[in-house]
C-alpha cells in the first residue's frame, strides 16, 4: 500500500490522462470542464468563486472541508502539471514524458520518515533582474535608495510590496494568529528566498493543523 497521496493540479482537461498515468490524483481548477475522474473545488462546501484571488488555495479549502478524512495515507503531497517532485537531481534535457514515471516521487522512503515536510528548491529574489525592477518601480528606489545597492535590502517583503501593492502584506500578516504572526513577519523582512508554486509534501496530520491555521 502506498504511504502517500499526491494531488496534481491543472487548469487544462487535456492533462488528465498524463496525471492518471503517473498514478497521481488529478485536480481540475478554473472554468474549463473536466471529467468526473478529476477532483474539483466546485462541489460541496467550497470557495471556488475566489479562485482568481486565492489560486490553488480554493482547492486546499475544499479538501479541508470535504475530503481530508478520506485521505488514509501517512503523507500527502501537492504538485502542478509540469512541476513535479523528482527522486534526485536530474538535468532538464534528460527529462521527457516517457521517463517521467520513473523519476517522480511515488513513495516516501524510510530515510525521510523523520521529516515533517519536504519542499522543492528555493527561488531567490536576488536573482531577479534589477533592471526590470527599476524600469517599472523607479519611485520605490527613490524612496528607499539603499535597496539599489544591497541585495539583502531587497528582501521578500520588498518584492511583495513592489509587485502586489505596498501595505497588503502587512494587512495579511495581521490576520495571522499570535503564535505565527511575528515569525512570519520576521521571515519576510529577513529572507531573500522562498519555496514557490504552493508545492509541498507533508505528513497528513500536519496538513490538518496547517488548514486550521490558514483558514478561518
Residue positions per predicted region:
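ER/Golgi luminal nucleotide-sugar-dependent glycosyltransferases, focusing on the catalytic module
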Residues: 1-216
Amino acid at each position: 500500500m502506498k504511504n502517500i497521496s499526491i494531488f496534481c493540479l491543472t487548469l487544462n482537461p487535456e492533462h488528465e490522462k498524463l496525471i492518471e498515468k503517473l498514478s497521481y490524483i488529478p485536480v481540475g481548477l478554473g472554468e474549463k470542464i473536466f471529467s468526473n475522474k478529476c477532483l474539483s473545488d466546485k462541489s460541496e462546501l467550497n470557495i471556488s468563486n475566489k479562485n482568481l484571488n486565492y489560486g490553488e488555495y480554493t482547492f486546499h479549502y475544499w479538501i479541508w472541508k470535504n475530503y481530508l478524512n478520506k485521505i488514509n495515507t501517512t503523507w500527502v503531497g501537492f504538485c502542478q502539471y509540469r512541476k513535479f517532485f523528482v527522486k534526485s537531481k536530474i538535468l532538464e534535457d534528460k527529462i521527457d514524458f516517457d521517463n517521467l514515471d520513473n523519476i517522480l516521487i511515488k513513495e516516501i522512503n524510510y530515510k525521510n520518515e523523520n521529516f515533517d515536510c519536504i519542499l522543492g528548491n528555493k527561488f531567490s529574489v536576488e536573482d531577479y533582474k534589477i533592471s526590470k525592477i527599476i524600469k517599472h518601480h523607479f519611485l520605490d528606489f527613490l524612496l528607499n535608495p539603499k535597496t539599489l545597492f544591497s541585495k539583502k535590502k531587497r528582501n521578500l517583503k520588498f518584492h511583495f510590496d513592489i509587485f502586489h501593492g505596498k501595505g497588503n502584506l502587512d494587512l495579511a500578516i495581521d490576520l495571522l494568529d499570535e503564535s505565527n504572526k511575528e515569525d512570519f513577519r520576521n521571515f519576510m523582512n529577513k529572507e531573500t528566498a522562498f519555496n514557490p508554486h504552493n508545492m509541498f509534501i507533508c505528513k497528513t496530520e500536519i496538513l490538518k493543523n496547517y488548514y486550521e491555521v490558514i483558514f478561518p
